[in-house]
Amino acid sequence: MSDEPDSPPLPPEAEAFLRHLAEQKRYSARTVRNYRQALERFTAWLRGQPGSLHPLMVSSRHVRRYLMELQTVYERRTSNLHLSALRSFYRYQLRLGKIEASPLAGISGPKLEKKLPKFLTEKQIALLLAGPKRLLENEAIEPFTALRDRLVMELLYGGGFRVSELSDLNYGTFDEQSGVARIRGKGGKERLCPVGEVALECLKMFRAQFARHSGPQDPVLITEQGRRLSVRRIQLMLKRYLDLADLPHDLTPHKIRHSYATHLLDNGADLRLVQELLGHASLSTTQIYTHVSVARLKDMHRRAHPRA
C-alpha cells in the first residue's frame, strides 16, 4: 500500500489486535502487515478530525466519510482490504466488550468485478513439472536441486497448498503411510491434505537421498545449506521453470493452487470436498472454480458444436 501518510503510533487496542492475529489466529506476516497499514492510515485520519478521535469513539458516520475518502485514493479492491481490516478490528473489540456496537455494521465496501482465477491446463502442468529433469539432463543444475525443485512443484500441485503452507511443511506434518499432510492454514484452521502417490514418492526419494537424518520438526523443503526454503525462494524458483516451459510469467505459486482446484472439479470432484481440501471457510470462495469449469465447457461447446 503506497502513498500512506506518516504513521502515528497505534493505540494499545490496535497493537493487541495485531498480536492476536499473529499469535492466536496465525495470520501470515503479510496479512498482519497489511492490517497494520490499514489501521495506521485510519488512525492518522482520525487524528486529523475535529477532536482528534480515538478509534473506539467513532461512529458509522465517521466510517462512511473515511470510506468515501479511501475510494478517491485507492482502487476498489484496496479500499475493501482496508475496510476488511477495520471490520475485523471492531469485531474483536466488540467481543472483548470494549464497544457496544461495531461502527461498520450495515456498511459494505464497493462492489468488485468478479475475475475468474487464472490456472494452468493439465498439459501446461506436465510441462512445468518436467522442467527440473530437463535442466538436470543438460547438467544445468545439481541432482539435489533437481529433485528438490520437482518436489516443490509436485507438492504444490498434488496438495493444493498455499505457498506459505508449503514453506512451513515439516516431516512431522506428513503421514508417509497414507500420504496425507496435516496443515494449519489461515486463521489457525487445521485440514488434511492428501498429496497423491507421485508427490509422496518424490518426497520419500528426496528424504532418502538428501535428508536421511531429518526428524519430525525438520523442514521438508530446504536449501543446499539445509535451511528452510523461504516463500520468496519458492516464488523465484517457479519463475525459472515457467520461463523454461515458455509459460506466462504472471503465473504464481497460487495459480498452481487454482489449477489444482479447477482440475479436481473438471474431473468430477464434489464442490464441498474441494472446499475442505482448500481450507476455504466459505463455500462461495470455492464456487468461483465452478465458474471456470463452466466457462471451459462453454468454450468447448462454441468451438465444437456446428450451431454454436
What is each model feature region?
Residues 1-308:
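Conserved catalytic core of the tyrosine transesterase superfamily
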